[in-house]
A protein has these predicted regions:
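Short beta-strand and adjacent tight-turn residues that come in two discontinuous sequence segments
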Residues: 10, 189, 598
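Beta-propeller folds
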Residues: 7, 16-403, 411-413, 709-714
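Sec-dependent N-terminal signal peptides
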Residues: 3-13
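Serine-hydrolase catalytic core recognition
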Residues: 199, 260, 394-715
Length: 715
């Protein structure tokens, strides 16, 4: 404890300040924009031929303009798919007008007419363009310029083909719900029957009488869409239905093996603690179990699955032994190898070199907040570190894995981008040798010096349960240990998340602005956050919010004992799950937190979607106390300090309902509060053209300065 106190009491490090950070610098002027870097594997890259898009017109003679997106056809280099007039839908989905461009004769063909479509793709053989329009999966045959409908029963809020329903898109993190087979003979797709899913409606304040937006959103305990997987035979125009146990289940992924006739359907029960991979025949839909994993809490779903080109093995990551590691299994079940081990977690697979039988991956090592690059062979017996030390390394490899572009930064230093060569010596040992540096962010570093950016330090704080929590601290400019400063906790805290990271940007420009104003800014990763093993992350199972806020309270109490902290001026702010935490801080944490800002907060998990919520809490019927005991709505009578709640009225993710129900509880408890709402804004509450982003951050900043400021802060 004494060593920890001495570490915390170290003076703040910062550059001499000549300029003052303003909100305009952060949110309008782009003063701290990162240096542009041109990094590639080739020494000289011929510039792409310039195309005058203004000479192309649509069917009505209107200029199409510069495309929003250009999709190349790998099978035929002369073909490109253009997306124009793109509109966002939800977090991962958007719709556009589509055009097929042929660079050989500069011809332009509109695909799908004047109706906007989603998820356009070329087939692997370059014969077709697939897309989703009006909830139906469509195919455009390029040689004959004809369109065929794979499905015809699509209908808004009833049937979806080839695209996800809202909750799958948000929580299973994909939107395009179809996959081409490797050779392009088949296309597997999802069919969602969401007719039994309850609707949620949002008022859009867009005309004299407003409008009503309704969509299917299953809240905790509600019924889900009925999901079916079909495999369409492109050549014969026939389809087979994938066979699996139906009922209250999820299909979080489908993936093809290298065999054009073998689809893998990922099956999961509603509790999400059983995952099965079902090997499914393309022609008949018959299936058999390829892999099964069970967990006493829940199984994490991700895209870390590779079906190798040899047709015999697959690679994947799993927490089955307490930490996320890599495994190599045989498709016939005869081989089961754990390739990586230890108490440091694999965070990303950067590439699989099947020729040399090596896997390149990133680990949270040597500390949970660091990232380093490693390589391991398929036997798991030879492992080499390609980067070392504390900091954050991110890598992109070339096709043959002979080189990679390395992006390195740490919490106080902008990124350096370099080209690294993978070297294999005579004893087959592997290391990386730097070939060249593309950029070291000189302009940003100079700007940081001019504005006197402070240096954040990592801290470790004990909680009352015997764990030690990781955090970072940014002290005020010109820190004086004889003075008392207010503290602002910046927290997200949700399952598997991480804010205490040794990368540039973890401490934001806004944090630096607050430090210049005289605030101590702190972030602490509580119990339930990621990269410290399964048990630390899953301790919060069935009781979201309980241990998390107890950790934040412990950290605030600890800091409040330090002689340079104004214990009566400790605040907490967060967004989304972080807003849930801030609302708990001002209620259950009323003894230590004197102010809180909650932006777009969940205020009761009864109001949130079922896939996310039930993964950690099961259903409200099964776990009523878990839902209610830690809902800030049920603790408003404890509030002693100041509370600001902010929400967008068109938040499709965390509904505005959460704010209204919290305010209802505040009124009932006769608690004074402040609120702000942003009409027609979604969960991100953003917008540069209409000034929303600047307005929100200005309001929040001024409120914090006014409520938490003391004699040692600037207003």
């Amino acid at each position: 404890m004494r060593l920890l106190f001495l570490f915390l009491a170290l003076p703040a490090l910062c550059w001499s300040q000549t300029k003052t950070i303003t909100l305009e610098d952060v949110y309008k002027k782009g003063t701290f924009r990162t240096d542009p870097v041109s990094a590639s594997f080739s020494e000289s890259k011929a510039p792409s031929p310039s195309i005058n898009w203004d000479r192309f017109s649509d069917a009505q003679g209107k200029k199409i303009g510069r495309p929003d997106d250009i999709i190349a056809c790998e099978a035929k280099a002369n073909l490109q798919l253009l997306r124009t007039k793109t509109e966002p839908i939800y977090r991962r989905s958007s719709k556009s007008l589509l055009y097929l461009f042929n660079s050989t004769d500069s011809s332009l063909v509109q695909i799908g007419g004047d109706t906007k479509s989603l998820h356009p793709q070329f087939s692997p053989d370059g014969q077709y363009i697939s897309y989703v329009q009006n909830n139906n999966l469509m195919l455009f045959h390029i040689p004959t310029a004809t369109t065929q409908a794979v499905t015809t029963d699509g209908k808004w809020n009833f049937i979806i083909n080839g695209n996800c329903d809202w909750v799958y898109e948000e929580e299973f993190e994909f939107s395009r719900a179809y996959e081409w087979s490797p050779k392009g003979n088949y296309i597997a797709y999802y069919r969602f029957d969401e007719s039994g899913v309850k609707e949620f409606n949002m008022t859009m304040y867009d005309n004299a009488h407003n409008s009503d937006y309704r969509y299917k959103y299953p809240k905790a305990g509600d019924d889900n869409s009925v999901v079916e997987i079909y495999i369409y035979d492109v050549n014969n125009a026939t389809k087979a239905k994938a066979q699996y146990e139906t009922g209250d289940i999820y299909i979080p992924r489908i993936k093809w093996t290298t065999d054009d006739r073998q689809l893998v359907v990922f099956w999961m029960n509603r509790h999400q603690n059983v995952l099965k991979l079902l090997s499914t025949e393309a022609t008949t839909g018959k299936s058999s179990t390829l892999y099964e994993e069970k967990n006493k809490y829940f199984v994490e779903i991700n895209d870390d699955w590779w079906f190798l080109k040899d047709g015999k093995h697959f690679l994947f990551s799993s927490e089955m032994n307490g930490y996320r590691h890599l495994y190599l299994y045989g498709l016939d079940g005869t081989i089961k190898k754990q390739l990586t081990k230890g108490n440091a977690e694999v965070t990303e697979v950067n590439g699989v070199d099947e020729v040399n039988k090596r896997i390149y991956y990133t680990m949270a090592w040597p500390r949970p907040m660091d990232r380093n690059l490693f390589v391991t062979d398929f036997s798991g017996e030879k492992t080499y570190a390609l980067t070392q030390g504390e900091g954050w390394n991110r890598a992109t490899f070339n096709e043959d894995f002979s080189k990679f572009i390395l992006y390195y930064s740490n919490i106080n230093t902008p990124q350096t981008v370099s080209l690294q060569q993978v070297m294999v010596d005579k004893k087959k040992a592997i290391n990386a040798v730097q070939e060249k540096v593309f950029g070291e962010s000189p302009k940003l570093k100079a700007t940081m010096r001019d504005y006197g950016f402070g240096a954040a330090s990592f801290i470790r704080i004990p909680n009352s349960k015997g764990d030690t929590l990781n955090g970072w601290m940014l002290k005020p400019t010109g820190f004086d240990s004889t003075k008392k400063y207010p503290v602002l906790f910046c927290n997200y805290g949700g399952p598997g998340s991480q804010q205490v990271a040794n990368r540039f940007g973890a401490v934001s420009n806004w944090h630096q602005l607050l430090a210049q104003k005289g605030f101590i800014v702190v972030s602490v990763d509580n119990t339930g956050t990621g990269y410290r093993g399964e048990e630390f992350k899953k301790k919060t199972y069935l009781q979201l919010g309980k241990l998390e806020i107890e950790d934040q309270i412990d950290a605030a109490s600890f800091l409040g004992q330090q002689p340079w902290v104004d214990k009566n001026k400790i605040g907490h702010w967060g967004w989304s799950y972080g807003g849930f935490m801030s609302s708990l801080a001002i209620t259950k944490g009323a003894s230590v937190f004197s102010a809180a800002v909650a932006v777009a907060p969940v205020t009761s998990w009864r109001f949130y979607d079922n896939i996310y919520t039930e993964r950690y809490m099961r259903t409200p019927k099964e776990n009523a106390a878990g839902y209610d005991d830690n809902s800030p709505i049920n603790h408003t009578d404890k509030i002693k300090g100041k509370y600001l709640i902010i929400h967008g009225t068109a938040d499709d993710n965390v509904h505005f309902q959460n704010a209204t129900q919290m305010i209802t509880a505040l009124v009932k408890s006769n608690i004074d509060f402040e609120s702000a709402y942003y009409p027609n804004k979604n969960h991100g509450i953003g917008g540069m053209a209409d000034n929303t982003t600047f307005h929100l951050w200005s309001k929040k900043t001024k409120w914090i300065l006014n409520v938490l400021g003391n004699e040692n802060t600037l207003r």
